[in-house]
Amino acid sequence: MTIDINKLKEELGLGDLAKSLEGLTAAQKAQEAERMRKEQEEKELARMNDLVSKAVGEDRKRLEEALELVKSLDEKSKKSNELFAQTVEKQQETIVGLQDEIKSLLTAREGRSFVGDSVAKALYGTQENFEDEVEKLVLLSYVMEKGVFETEHGQRHLKAVNQSSSVEVSSESYETIFSQRIIRDLQKELVVGALFEELPMSSKILTMLVEPDAGKATWVAASTYGTDTTTGEEVKGALKEIHFSTYKLAAKSFITDETEEDAIFSLLPLLRKRLIEAHAVSIEEAFMTGDGSGKPKGLLTLASEDSAKVVTEAKADGSVLVTAKTISKLRRKLGRHGLKLSKLVLIVSMDAYYDLLEDEEWQDVAQVGNDSVKLQGQVGRIYGLPVVVSEYFPAKANSAEFAVIVYKDNFVMPRQRAVTVERERQAGKQRDAYYVTQRVNLQRYFANGVVSGTYAAS
């Protein structure tokens, strides 16, 4: 793919400011141009940062990477056209790979949407309100089994947009916004589910070949130069097949077939909230305690299967509290993984969290430095170990788990397709059933990488 450098420079907003500087002296022009440039850059960067901050998971990481690339290209362009061209040529593959994210950032940078920010703002006040309306229209179309612009509300919306803009809108764009926002808001509800990288899948089963151990290189003497032994011994590794799969998760709601469209439209935010919360609860619960039967196998189950269930001195009756030293002992069970602090996360029950608050080693989020990476739902740190709280541990009792330490890089969250809405007509009950479905799972590459702590037996 060939990149048009001039077009890219234009999209990056690198035009001149001549029209704004007419009637000024040379010194004034220079000063005013610098002020306007800085002001413009600050506004543009704020808009792009806002777009990145609203994204979650893998989308956010790709947007962050694209944002750094855009900043780099900006800097190179300011220095010289030749340097800019050389940078584009060197990073052509990266630019092509992130082209969708770059387009989104540049659109946000200019304050535009696919129907024009001015139109969205004129009709709904803000872009966020506009997208809320778009989401309702798409969900309503699923409920009514009509096209996005075939419902009464959809027709009125299309008419209003057409009167305000010459841009032709498509239902596909609206459905994309709907799907992205549903996933975004669902992921915001997750704590444990937000810890792991997502693995996009296009089929029910994905097979991956991996090498468990890297093997060792060979030290060779200088005297072996020119012989076969100068390249060292062959590194022999046994490849292992890993099969990734997903489980279907569905949340259901009902609406009677006599309900009018206006009434349904008013209830859509409530319907949406209920379905999202139902999905979040099920994912969090399964990722902690799932048994692998029709649902993901949870972290506590995996720790038990690995014989990595450590009995601690902490007692369920509260006579011996959970302490930082208690948690530190669990890391020993992780072996070499326990040394990689930046890749570990501690998940604790609510009771264990309140115990740790009394520990002198506890750092709440206000004490964690701004340069530290904070996880979604993070409440603090223990010995530098990030801590999140889950309410889906077993009830507090003798021998019950209260904490789990997980090596994040060993786990992945397979996802097949996006969130979908399905409808089922139940004629005998005179109602329609609506399902919000997605296919996800929690899997790991290799055994181990997780350890749980339990209260004492008595």
Swiss-Prot record:
Keyword Zinc-finger recorded? no
Matching entries from Pfam families are given as:
Phage_capsid
One Gene Ontology BP term is:
symbiont-mediated evasion of host immune response
Gene Ontology cellular-component terms for this entry are: T=13 icosahedral viral capsid; viral capsid; viral scaffold
Q: Which domain of life is it from?
A: Viruses
Q: Changing Y353C: what effect?
A: Confers resistance to Pycsar-mediated defense, reduced fitness compared to wild-type phage
Q: Which Gene3D superfamilies match?
A: Major capsid protein gp5
What is the name of the protein in this document? Answer: Major capsid protein
Report the source organism.
Escherichia phage T5 (Enterobacteria phage T5)
Gene coding for it: D20
